C-alpha cells in the first residue's frame, strides 16, 4: 500500500478507455465543485439529476446550486429509495423525466445516490436518445468503490438481480467522501464488503492492510480516501482489461453468485439483507466452497470470515433474519446468474487470499450438496 495522503487531498483515478476514458475524483467537497468539474468536461448545459427520497434532502440542493453556478440548467427526478426501485416502472419514470427536461445527447444525466440510483440512472442515460452523457455522484461507500465505476447499468427482474441492462460508461465520477459521514453504520459496513473484495481477488497486501487499518477506514480521513482510491484503481484496472466482461472482469463478481441468489431469495428486502451483506456472506461461501473442492486451505476461509465478522458484517446464511427457501430454490437463482454459459455454472473461486480465478463448468451436484450443508 502507498503512504496515506493528507486528509484534505483529492485523488484522481483515470480509466483509460480510449474515447470513453474518464476520471474518478475522490475526496472531500466534490459536490460543491461538481458544476465546475462537469462544465470543464462536457459541452452540454442541461442536466437531469436522478436521486432518491433519502438522498435528495441531504445533497440535492447543494448539487443544483453548484450546477447553477457553472451555468448548467437542471431538473430533478426523485425516486423511492431501496432495491425495489430497480424496476421497469421506475426506469420509465426516469426516462420520461429526462425527456421532459429536454436533455440532449451532449447534455447529461447525473446519478446522485447509491448503487440503486446509479444503476438505474445509467440505464436511462444509455437508452434515452440511444445514449446521453452520464455523470456519477455516488453517495454510498458501495457505490463509490464499485457500482459507479465500470459502466454496468441495469435493473432487476423476478428471475434475478441486474439481469436487464446495458453497458454505458460514465463521463465522470465524483466520489465526495464527505457524504459518507451521513451513512448509517450498516450501510458503511455493507460498502466495506466490496472494498475487502478487491484484496481477496488479487491484492493480498491490500487485504492485509485492511485487516490492520479497517478501524481508521471506518473513522474517516486519509485512510478512508486511500482505501477508496485503491479500490477504484483495482476496479479500473480490471475494467480496462475487459470492459464487456468477456474474461477477467468476471473476477469482480467474487461473492456475487451466492450473494445475488440470497438477495433474490429475500425478495430484495433491505430490512433482511442489503447487497454488501450478501456479498460478504457470498465471499465466505466462495472461499469455503473452494476449500471443499480442495482448491484452497480452510484456513483462508476462516481468515476471511474472521475479518468480516470483526467489522460487523454477516458471514453465514443463518445471519439473515427470517426463513430462507430451500437449497434447491437458491440453486435455481444461481442458474440464472449472468456468468452462466451454455447452461454451465461459472463461479469465482480461489486458491488462496488474493488468488481468485474464474471456474467454468462447476458441477451443479457439488453446489447443491454444499448449499444443503450450509442451509439444511
UniProtKB/Swiss-Prot annotation:
Its predominant location is: cytoplasm
Pathway connected to this protein = Metabolic intermediate biosynthesis; chorismate biosynthesis; chorismate from D-erythrose 4-phosphate and phosphoenolpyruvate: step 2/7
Its domain of life reads: Bacteria
- GO BP term (any one): amino acid biosynthetic process
Q: Name one GO molecular function term.
A: 3-dehydroquinate synthase activity
Q: What is this protein's name?
A: 3-dehydroquinate synthase
- The organism is Rhizobium leguminosarum bv. trifolii (strain WSM2304)
User: Among its keywords, does the record have Zinc?
Assistant: yes
Arranged from A to Z, the UniProt key words for this protein are: Amino-acid biosynthesis, Aromatic amino acid biosynthesis, Cobalt, Cytoplasm, Lyase, Metal-binding, NAD, Nucleotide-binding, Zinc
Amino acid at each position: 500500500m502507498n503512504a496515506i495522503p493528507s486528509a484534505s487531498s483529492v485523488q484522481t483515478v483515470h480509466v483509460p478507455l480510449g474515447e470513453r476514458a474518464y476520471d474518478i475524483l475522490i475526496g472531500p467537497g466534490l459536490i460543491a465543485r461538481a458544476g465546475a468539474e462537469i462544465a470543464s468536461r462536457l459541452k452540454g448545459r442541461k442536466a437531469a439529476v436522478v436521486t432518491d427520497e433519502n438522498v435528495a434532502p441531504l445533497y440535492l440542493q447543494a448539487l443544483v446550486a453548484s450546477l447553477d453556478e457553472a451555468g448548467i440548467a437542471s431538473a430533478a427526478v426523485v425516486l423511492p429509495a431501496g432495491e425495489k426501485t430497480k424496476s421497469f416502472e421506475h426506469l420509465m419514470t426516469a426516462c420520461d423525466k429526462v425527456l421532459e427536461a429536454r436533455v440532449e445527447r451532449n447534455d447529461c444525466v447525473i446519478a446522485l445516490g447509491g448503487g440503486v440510483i446509479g444503476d438505474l440512472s445509467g440505464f436511462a442515460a444509455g437508452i434515452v436518445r440511444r445514449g446521453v452523457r452520464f455523470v456519477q455522484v455516488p453517495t454510498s461507500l458501495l457505490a463509490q468503490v464499485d457500482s459507479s465505476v465500470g459502466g454496468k447499468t441495469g435493473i432487476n427482474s423476478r428471475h434475478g438481480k441486474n439481469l436487464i441492462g446495458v453497458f454505458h460508461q460514465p463521463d465522470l465520477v465524483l466520489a465526495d467522501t464527505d457524504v459518507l459521514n451521513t451513512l448509517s453504520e450498516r450501510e458503511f459496513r455493507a460498502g466495506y464488503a466490496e472494498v475487502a473484495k478487491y484484496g481477496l481477488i488479487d491484492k493480498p497486501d491490500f487485504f492485509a492492510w485492511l485487516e490492520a487499518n479497517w478501524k481508521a477506514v471506518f473513522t474517516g480521513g486519509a485512510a478512508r480516501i486511500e482505501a477508496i482510491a485503491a479500490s477504484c484503481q483495482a476496479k479500473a484496472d480490471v475494467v480496462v482489461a475487459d470492459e464487456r466482461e468477456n474474461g477477467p472482469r468476471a473476477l469482480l463478481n467474487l461473492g456475487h453468485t451466492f450473494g445475488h441468489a440470497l438477495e433474490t431469495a429475500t425478495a430484495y428486502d433491505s430490512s433482511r439483507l442489503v447487497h454488501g451483506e450478501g456479498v460478504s456472506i457470498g465471499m465466505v461461501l466462495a472461499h469455503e466452497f473452494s476449500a471443499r473442492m480442495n482448491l484452497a486451505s480452510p484456513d483462508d476461509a476462516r481468515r476471511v470470515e474472521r475479518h468480516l465478522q470483526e467489522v460487523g458484517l454477516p458471514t453465514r446464511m443463518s445471519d439473515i433474519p427470517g426463513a430462507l427457501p430451500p437449497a434447491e430454490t437458491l440453486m435455481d437463482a444461481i442458474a440464472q446468474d449472468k456468468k452462466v454459459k451454455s447452461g454451465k455454472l461459472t463461479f469465482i473461486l480461489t486458491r488462496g487470499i488474493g488468488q481468485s480465478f474464474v471456474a467454468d463448468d462447476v458441477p451443479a451436484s457439488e453446489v447443491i450438496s454444499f448449499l444443503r450443508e450450509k442451509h439444511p
